[in-house]
A protein has these predicted regions:
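Conserved small/polar residues in nucleotide/adenosyl-binding loops
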Residues: 360-367
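Segments forming glycine/polar-rich beta-alpha architectures that bind adenosine-containing cofactors
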Residues: 251-255, 267-275
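N-terminal helix-rich structural modules
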Residues: 19-218, 222-236, 240-260
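Active-site-proximal, well-structured secondary-structure segments within enzyme catalytic domains
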Residues: 287-330, 334
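Bacterial signal peptide processing site
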Residues: 10-12
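C-terminal motif of bacterial Sec signal peptides marking the signal peptidase cleavage site
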Residues: 5-8
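Active-site scaffold of zinc-dependent metalloenzymes
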Residues: 29, 36, 385-409
Length: 409
């Protein structure tokens, strides 16, 4: 919005535009240990209408997946968030009451972190309001505004979620990755069903991988929740017609609309392959989509949408849903290219010991890599971590480069 206002004022005096820039307020809000910032989007107005329409539908697709991540982080995240939102919008009391202010801060933290655990430390938030105040607030909210299960009363709902909010021992950490414990049972995340143990998960996927392709394997378990049904482990795949179908159908709908505004055939193929993957849940199609995505260095608009990173799973198998949408800032790219072209000069004049110099290699001459980093800093670390074949080739290239440097030394 600010970018559009500034562009509309280009006919006015430069000092007025400069004043507008100086008065731009980057800080939206500040609470707990967080400061919420907003930024200008330079270059947006220079995009074509078609590119803006593409960005719009890709951004809408990103918004459609929000609740998937909430649910993946903890099975109580959505019920708690919706209950807090109902209280926040319907509260009739004094909004300056310290108890309500604390509840508001807690809700904001939940919004920011996509759940009741800290976005970085992953420890559960400590509410600054009391269980009694929370119960009073809930009692003032109509049952129709609460996320009650069929047949569940308001009292039963409060009794179920209160320990999750207030008891520090219940679901204390989103992802437990160390210690002499069952990592699955100790973690609060929702990638595995109740009663599923770490040993069972490891055995399940070991059997699934046995005798399969080891050169270019798929990312087993990447897009599914492992649950027990009648005592048997079953994968519930995240796809159209599967788990999270309602949200994924909306994502697919926006991606289909975006296809009409693709910048080129390659980008159209990328979006089409992603749609095919969402509809089938086939991880081989995900690999094909990922390869197409990595190969596209011509499009100005870029995006990530899907189950990508596995940091949320203590076993590093299940992927959390995420989406980013971006486009090339061509002026910033020119500046970055100047730095990249002169990277060797910066290294030569840095205080780093020459022992660690890369002068013997051609690392700064690989313009493709520089272009990738300029396009989207996330590109090199998103997607590739799950494509074993590409990772293996990349590691091989790094090892060869290191060997060449060692030989020259």
């Amino acid at each position: 919005m600010t970018a559009m206002v500034m562009t509309a004022c280009t006919g006015q005096k430069a000092e007025k535009v400069e004043a507008t820039q100086d008065n731009f307020n980057y800080v939206v809000d500040q609470f707990a240990d967080l400061q919420i910032l907003r930024y200008r989007v330079p270059g947006f107005e220079s995009l074509s209408l078609k590119q803006k329409q593409l960005l719009y539908h890709l951004s809408e697709a990103a918004l459609m997946g929000r609740d998937i991540l909430f649910d993946q982080n903890c099975r109580y995240n959505l019920p708690i968030r919706r209950a807090l939102e109902a209280v926040y919008t319907g509260y009739k009391g004094d909004r300056t009451d310290p108890q309500f202010v604390a509840l508001e801060t807690y809700l904001k933290r939940v919004w920011f972190a996509n759940g009741i655990h800290h976005h970085y430390a992953e420890d559960k938030f400590v509410p600054g309001f009391t269980p009694e105040f929370f119960q009073t607030c809930i009692s003032q909210v109509g049952a129709s505004a609460l996320p009650l299960r069929e047949g569940q009363t308001v009292e039963q709902f409060v009794a179920e979620i209160s320990p999750v909010i207030f008891d520090p021992a219940v679901m204390a950490k989103r992802t437990v990755q160390s210690g002499d414990v069952d990592l699955i049972r100790a973690s609060a995340n929702n990638y595995y069903g109740e009663g599923v143990t770490q040993v069972e998960v490891e055995d399940f996927y070991a059997r699934m991988k046995a005798g399969k392709d080891t050169i270019s394997p798929i990312s087993y378990g990447l897009n599914s929740r492992l649950v027990k049904e009648n005592g048997k482990l079953v994968e519930k795949v995240w796809k159209v017609g599967g788990l999270y179908s309602s949200a994924i159908e909306k994502i697919v709908s926006e991606l289909q609309k975006a296809t009409a505004f693709a910048e080129n055939d390659a980008q159209k193929s990328i979006i089409g392959k992603l749609i095919e993957y969402y509809q089938s849940g086939d991880l081989k199609i995900f690999d094909a989509y990922s390869i197409l995505w990595v190969e596209d260095t011509a499009s100005d608009v870029d995006f990530v949408n899907g189950f990508i990173e596995t940091y949320g799973d203590p076993l590093g198998m299940k992927a959390s849903w995420e989406s980013t949408v971006n486009f090339i800032n061509k002026e910033a790219t020119k500046r970055t290219k100047v730095i990249s072209d002169n990277a060797q000069w910066f290294e030569d004049h840095s205080p780093v010991d020459k022992l660690y110099s890369s002068a013997a290699s051609d690392v700064y001459k690989r313009q493709g890599f520089a272009a990738i980093m300029v396009r989207n800093p996330l590109r090199s670390r998103i997607s590739l971590r799950h494509m074993t074949k590409l990772l293996r080739e990349m590691v091989l290239m790094m090892n060869l480069s290191g060997a060449i440097r060692s030989a020259k030394d």
